[in-house]
């Protein structure tokens, strides 16, 4: 779907541009100014961002097979982390086509990105504190992953975007038939019908 592909490429370009403009060409960068941590000024601190030494495992949803991959891949690569992409089985062929184009471009070092279209097997058992798991999908699967013994025991950083329940709020001062009301109805209709409403903003 054009929204999926164009949105994914657009998101990736925004992240890459932000990295090019705002981050140094280095393995670490200083985030913010020196801050006083004690009343006397004897203790000060400053955030220094460095990449984790592990891998980013991205378990993605079915409804945006390209966008989901690219929007997670871009910041991970920018942070210096290799990526393992695990797309949803239902749409993994679409993800694989886009992935093969990335590999064929030879823009990334060999092994910087990998794709698993089947079962993860025992991959999660081998992750540690320098690794990251990012999941998009159902609340039930998110709960299952979040409570995986190896992720807990090894303090693996886990992020989840799960079943979205979104509200659409229209101000009480908006009158039926006004341009604002008509736009609101049009946008709500679009959100619940595009991709059968199966997207995070529906």
What are these regions (language model features)?
Residues 1-41, 88:
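N-terminal Rossmann-like NAD(P)+-binding subdomain of aldehyde/semialdehyde dehydrogenases
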Residues 12, 95-98, 126-127, 145:
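Hydrophobic packing residues within well-ordered alpha-helices of enzyme cores
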Residues 36-99:
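Substrate-binding/gating loop at the entrance of the active-site cleft, primarily
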Residues 43-46, 113-134:
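A structured beta-alpha segment of the ubiquitous adenosine-cofactor-binding alpha/beta core
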Residues 54-55, 109-113:
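Short acidic capping loops at alpha-helix termini that bridge into adjacent secondary structure
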Residues 56, 63, 117-124, 137-142:
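Beta-loop-alpha module in the N-terminal Rossmann-like domain of NAD(P)-dependent dehydrogenases
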Residues 85, 117, 160-162:
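Hydrophobic residues in well-ordered beta-strands that form the structural core
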Residues 104-106, 129-132, 140-202:
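ALDH superfamily catalytic-core signature
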């Amino acid at each position: 779907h054009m929204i999926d592909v164009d949105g994914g490429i657009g998101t990736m370009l925004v992240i890459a541009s932000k990295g090019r403009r705002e981050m140094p060409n280095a393995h670490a960068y200083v985030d913010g100014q020196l801050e006083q941590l004690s009343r006397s000024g004897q203790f000060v601190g400053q955030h220094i961002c460095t990449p984790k030494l592990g891998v980013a495992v991205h378990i993605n949803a079915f409804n945006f097979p390209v966008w989901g991959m690219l929007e997670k891949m871009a910041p991970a690569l920018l942070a210096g982390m290799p990526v393992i992409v695990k797309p949803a089985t239902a749409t993994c062929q679409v993800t694989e086509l886009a992935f093969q184009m990335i590999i064929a471009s030879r823009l990334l070092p060999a092994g910087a990105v990998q794709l698993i279209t089947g079962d993860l097997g025992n991959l999660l058992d081998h992750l540690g504190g320098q690794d990251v798991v990012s999941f998009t999908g159902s609340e039930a699967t998110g709960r299952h992953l979040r409570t995986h013994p190896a992720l807990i025991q090894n303090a693996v950083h886990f992020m989840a975007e799960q079943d979205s329940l979104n509200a659409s709020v229209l101000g009480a001062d908006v009158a039926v038939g006004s341009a604002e009301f008509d736009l609101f109805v049009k946008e709500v209709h679009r959100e619940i019908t595009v991709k059968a409403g199966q997207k995070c903003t529906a």
